[in-house]
């Protein structure tokens, strides 16, 4: 993808700017009102551009709205490609493939899991702060052994 070819990376950034601004300013489709272009990846041969998008405020939970937005993007694909070609000045304009970006939704799930884990850690820390050993500190050490150890040190010093 765009990682190995610097020209592909520049074209991907250009496509992202053009598609995002066109969705916002030129396409007057209500289905695309909350669409955000998150990333564009262009193949090294500059033939295909995958445009990753997400919906603001929905995190992918509204399946019906997501499908309607995908339909609107697919319908506007030709118009957006011609706008990209016009603004980029490329001889061959890459084909646009719109892919829903799952990363933001997954990131929210991971954040929720981490918040639960942090809350459990805090509860355990509170319990540990007031916890005491169930018995003696060392149940195998007896008083007579402690005295014998003390006597050994006294006899060595003499």
Swiss-Prot record:
Biased composition (Acidic residues) is annotated at 145-158
What Pfam family is a match for this entry?
RBFA
Task: Provide the residue span(s) of the region labelled Disordered.
Answer: 130-158
Signal peptide positions are none
Q: What UniProt keywords apply to this chain's record, in alphabetical order?
A: Cytoplasm, Ribosome biogenesis
Q: Where in the cell is it found?
A: Cytoplasm
Q: Name one GO biological process term.
A: maturation of SSU-rRNA
Matching entries from SUPFAM superfamilies are given as:
Ribosome-binding factor A, RbfA (SSF89919)
Family membership: Belongs to the RbfA family.
Instruction: Enumerate the PANTHER family for this protein.
Output: RIBOSOME-BINDING FACTOR A, CHLOROPLASTIC-RELATED (PTHR33515:SF1)
Summary of the function given for this chain in its UniProt record: One of several proteins that assist in the late maturation steps of the functional core of the 30S ribosomal subunit. Associates with free 30S ribosomal subunits (but not with 30S subunits that are part of 70S ribosomes or polysomes). Required for efficient processing of 16S rRNA. May interact with the 5'-terminal helix region of 16S rRNA.
Subunit comment for this entry?
Answer: Monomer. Binds 30S ribosomal subunits, but not 50S ribosomal subunits or 70S ribosomes.
Name of this chain's protein: Ribosome-binding factor A
Q: Which gene encodes it?
A: rbfA
């Amino acid at each position: 993808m765009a990682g190995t070819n610097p020209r592909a990376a520049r074209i991907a950034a250009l496509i992202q700017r053009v598609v995002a601004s066109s969705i916002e300013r030129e396409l007057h489709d209500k289905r695309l009102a909350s669409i955000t272009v998150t990333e564009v990846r262009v193949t090294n041969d500059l033939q295909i551009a995958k445009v990753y998008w997400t919906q603001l405020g929905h995190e992918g939970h509204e399946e019906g709205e997501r499908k309607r937005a995908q339909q609107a993007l697919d319908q506007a694909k030709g118009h957006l490609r011609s706008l990209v070609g016009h603004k980029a000045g490329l001889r061959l304009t890459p084909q646009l493939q719109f892919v829903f970006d799952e990363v933001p939704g997954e990131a929210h799930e991971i954040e929720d899991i981490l918040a639960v884990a942090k809350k459990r850690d805090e509860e355990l820390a509170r319990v540990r702060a007031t916890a005491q050993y169930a018995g003696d500190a060392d149940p195998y050490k007896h008083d007579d052994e402690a005295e014998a150890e003390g006597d050994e040190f006294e006899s060595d010093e003499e």
